[in-house]
């Protein structure tokens, strides 16, 4: 892309720019890609998205490339190993949330519901187009 228009939040970090230009704002329909996104979004709680992006490959390695069939069988020893992995966020609740997400993913599948179909059903299977202008976090005082 030659001089694409970018949102101010991505700044000039090459990883963030790549994410902005190739991932952000593009509809995703693949069940496993959406499962990974759900898990990574949960890891972001209280942190910046760039923090998670910088650790994304570490997460893929640590969580068997977000394979719910494998994650659902993680035992206490595996949880402890994850909590000692310096390449990911080492928070017990966040680790456990990925395991619970895997259970939910497989439960939907076992009921014949695709994860993508489940998520997209909340927006009538259509992306929401938000054309509003950037709104600053602070408003100037009224005159």
Regions found by a protein language model. Give the residues of each.
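HhH-family (HhH-GPD) DNA N-glycosylase catalytic core used in base-excision repair
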Residues: 1-143
């Amino acid at each position: 892309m030659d001089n694409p228009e970018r949102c101010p939040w991505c700044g000039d970090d090459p990883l963030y720019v790549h994410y902005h230009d190739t991932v952000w704002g593009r509809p995703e329909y693949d069940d496993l890609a959406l499962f990974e996104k759900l898990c990574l979004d949960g890891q972001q709680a209280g942190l910046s998205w760039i923090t998670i992006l910088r650790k994304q490959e570490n997460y893929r390695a640590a969580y068997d490339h977000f394979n719910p069939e494998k994650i659902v069988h993680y035992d206490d020893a595996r949880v402890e190993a994850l909590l000692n992995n310096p390449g990911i966020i080492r928070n017990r609740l966040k680790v456990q949330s990925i395991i619970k997400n895997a259970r939910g993913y497989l439960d939907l599948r076992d009921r014949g519901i695709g994860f993508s179909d489940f998520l997209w059903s909340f927006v009538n299977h259509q992306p929401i187009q938000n054309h509003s202008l950037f709104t600053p976090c602070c408003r100037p005082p009224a005159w």
